[in-house]
């Protein structure tokens, strides 16, 4: 083998070695992209969130508005219940405002949801599951802590005794729910369905106090005028 041939084969060998390295680097980056976990203070169906993680108030809210007074709301028809999550009775207008959720929407965006009871959330690019990191300072009106146990309790309550619309959504969308810590809970969604809206859907479920229902023995399915 002459010197020219030797140099040619040496260069060819180095080329193939470099190509193999680049190939595996590309595969690694693709795998990272597929499995990359997004951590955020909210989630949007369309594009980017309007508000960043340290926003102090919504643009349409006056942070210096006077506190106190009363609000009068009109609505068609009548009501005999302040429990909007049971089939019994006709619930009053705005009766759902007494219940909070992990996420909440805004009035100046479409398809965006931000942490309310949840401080932050984690989910993969394909949105096949979501983890909610809850605010440890969150409490119910009776001053009892609001924890992942309450979220799990609420999920099961809605699944077994909630409105048919809630049961249908849960049955169609949610595969499993796991408590990962006192203030951390994971929703895994069913395969074979569009996942774009599922993290926000799971985060919108109302949260009920497990302590209240266990201690009082209250019937979740009963109509009541007690908020």
Features from the language model and the residues they span:
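N-terminal secretory signal peptides that target proteins for export/translocation
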Residues: 1-14
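Bacterial N-terminal signal peptides
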Residues: 14-28
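Hydrophobic membrane-targeting alpha-helices
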Residues: 24-32, 133, 158
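N-terminal lobe/hinge region of extracytoplasmic solute-binding protein
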Residues: 34-126, 133, 156, 223-227
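Aromatic- and charge-enriched surface segment that lines or borders ligand/interaction sites
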Residues: 61, 87-94, 120-164, 178-180, ...
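Short, surface-exposed helix-loop/turn micro-motifs enriched in polar/charged residues
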Residues: 113, 166-169
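Surface-exposed binding/hinge segments that line
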Residues: 168-221, 225
């Amino acid at each position: 083998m002459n010197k020219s041939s030797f140099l040619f084969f040496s260069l060819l060998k180095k080329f193939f070695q470099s190509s193999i390295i680049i190939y595996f680097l590309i595969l690694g980056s693709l795998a990272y992209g597929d499995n990359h976990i997004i951590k955020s203070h909210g989630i949007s169906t369309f594009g980017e969130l309007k508000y960043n993680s340290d926003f102090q108030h919504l643009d349409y809210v006056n942070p210096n508005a006077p506190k106190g007074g009363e609000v009068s709301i009109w609505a068609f028809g009548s009501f005999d219940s302040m429990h909007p999550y049971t089939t019994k009775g006709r619930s009053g207008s705005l009766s759902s405002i007494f219940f909070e959720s992990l996420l909440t929407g805004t009035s100046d965006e479409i398809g965006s949801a931000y942490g309310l009871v949840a401080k932050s959330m984690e989910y993969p690019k394909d949105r096949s599951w979501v983890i909610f990191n809850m605010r440890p300072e969150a409490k119910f009106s009776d001053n009892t802590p609001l924890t992942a146990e309450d979220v799990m309790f609420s999920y099961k309550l809605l699944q077994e005794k909630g409105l048919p619309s809630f049961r249908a959504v849960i049955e169609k969308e949610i595969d499993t729910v796991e408590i990962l810590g006192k203030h951390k809970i994971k929703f895994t969604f069913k395969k074979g369905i569009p996942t774009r809206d599922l993290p926000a859907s799971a985060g919108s479920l109302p949260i009920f106090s497990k302590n209240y229902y266990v201690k009082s023995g209250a019937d979740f399915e009963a109509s009541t005028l007690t908020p």
